């Protein structure tokens, strides 16, 4: 039996990070975690491009555009959607998730879902570097692993 795993070594890989500006007091912390993880695992700072978009709903469009350039080994998406009093939350979460998955499948480039979907501001803060770790960092580690796996099958 053969086991194939991706390695968490970012040297020689190129990454794009799409970050939603909405709730930037959270998304900026996710970005810090992602950049730190990429650099600690050997990525060159010049091989990391960060693109800011207005909100989570706009993430899939930009992620797909970046993946289609064939410049990147992986695209990381970062955003924060916090439940409010209306159904807007449900639409944004569902469409962002669906759009990101469709973009990855249609381009053949790993696009990592790093969009927080939380019930409260407190939950978002916990996932941006306090109690529950930093989901931006976790997304970057997943991007490195998937980029290496993807190279295995080219």
From Swiss-Prot:
Residues bound to (2S)-2-hydroxy-3-oxobutyl phosphate: 85-86, 127
Claim: Lipid biosynthesis is one of the keywords in the record: no
One GO term (biological process): riboflavin biosynthetic process
Alphabetic keyword roster: Riboflavin biosynthesis, Transferase
Enzyme class: transferase
Pathway stated in the Swiss-Prot or TrEMBL entry: Cofactor biosynthesis; riboflavin biosynthesis; riboflavin from 2-hydroxy-3-oxobutyl phosphate and 5-amino-6-(D-ribitylamino)uracil: step 1/2
A GO term, aspect molecular function: 6,7-dimethyl-8-ribityllumazine synthase activity
Subunit description: Forms an icosahedral capsid composed of 60 subunits, arranged as a dodecamer of pentamers.
Name this protein carries in UniProt: 6,7-dimethyl-8-ribityllumazine synthase
Organism of origin: Bacillus pumilus (strain SAFR-032)
